[in-house]
């Protein structure tokens, strides 16, 4: 096929016998026909991978099990589970798999099992949002289990259910914007210990269920949500530290080069092998790397091939080094398994951050994975199973106070009760602005109870009726009420500069009793922040009377609260 020529080719699969347990792709390549000064004959000038057929569902991991998991032993806060060829412990204080041993080999050292993780060492393109991640404490999340239950199932498995709150003790800040002035000192996060986080500060709540099978396989199924659904995260998933000897990394997914949601189609779905740290591209400024999308399975083994089923450094170690030579000696293999990782976008020199489908808002995510023992040469066979563990009930309350329960099961009824009251079968969203303790379980399995506590909703959702001035596009007035601190309202400046005063009419969607006003300033700079303010209320949107509050806000990024002298109806 010559330059600028077009032809239709038909690929005939008629004589090819497909294995229904495998998925198939076809790779198309355009090769250089003759040697050129810039490349040899056969050089791949273009290639594409096209899907042909999907694999049939693999058998359930539970189907091949024999025997039963022994009754676990409880020693203090640890639940110890052991069987033929495996030992593992779970921590009732954190809701985590605390340690894991297969065949006498330590796979997870005590305290380094899977923990919720939403942080990454910022890339150059993350400058559209990275300043927020330390403020939210994503680098320093601490897990606290608020509910626990265990159950030996009829099919011989052990089920451990946890509700876990993950929150930092305080937020932090850094001087990353000054990196060109003193690059040796600006990459550290400085925690603000003077402002400890409270129950209303950013946190995750996870309902998670571990299932241990008789052969030592352990499955995690979780539902993860946060109390700030509009916040933009770099990732959401689990991280664990494994012994550094487990440094042979194999995976079936896109590769071999790092890829992200918005930069992945050039890397094909194949089985890839290599050493941890040598499969990635180290940049002059160490930063997040090694991500692979569309991964079906991954395996880590040592030189002998013994294993469990991946970077030499943690995200904080990568972030803290100005240059590669300043990275510390590796002490572990850091494995991340993520429900979603934010794309890179192009904000360092292009159109902005990732597009909406490639962002990771702090809303709800279902995620699960299965850990199994493997040996060299058996990886593919061990991975040909599907999860079978119980999946948790999701409890979500929206900004209007409506509480909903969702599950991945179409025909399983959910039963709930509030503040220890009468159990009720869930039929429709429940008004729940006053908050309280909620317990929920499947009607056919009362042994696994998910528990979550919601605080009383004090704020009144607002909509905008009128705005005297706004910069259309990214800085419109809709951002004043979108509950997203990364966006902001700015008065017009592109066509003309609007003069003071500026005003906005808000609608509370009915008469409400109000006792104050909360204002979140622009987070990434002073332009557009409010200095002097006056607050008026009205019953009809026409007659406003005298201001019920007025004053001056400080020029900073901290949330401001104005308490009225007495509650008012508006």
Annotate each PLM feature:
Residues 30-38, 445-447:
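Short acidic/polar inter-strand loop motif in beta-rich domains
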Residues 12-21, 36, 50-388:
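Beta-strand/loop-rich accessory regions of lumenal/periplasmic or secreted enzymes
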Residues 232-236, 526-534:
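Short coil-to-beta strand junction motifs in C2/discoidin
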Residues 7-11, 365, 428-430, 502-504, ...:
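Short strand-edge motifs at loop-to-beta-strand transitions and within beta-strands
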Residues 1-21, 30:
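Intrinsically disordered, low-complexity Pro/Gly/Ser/Thr-rich segments with frequent PxxP/GP/PP motifs
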Residues 453-510, 522-529, 543, 549-555, ...:
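Disordered, acidic Ser/Thr/Pro-rich linker "stalks" and the adjacent N-terminal cap
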Residues 566-570:
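Noncatalytic modules at the cell exterior or secretory-pathway interfaces
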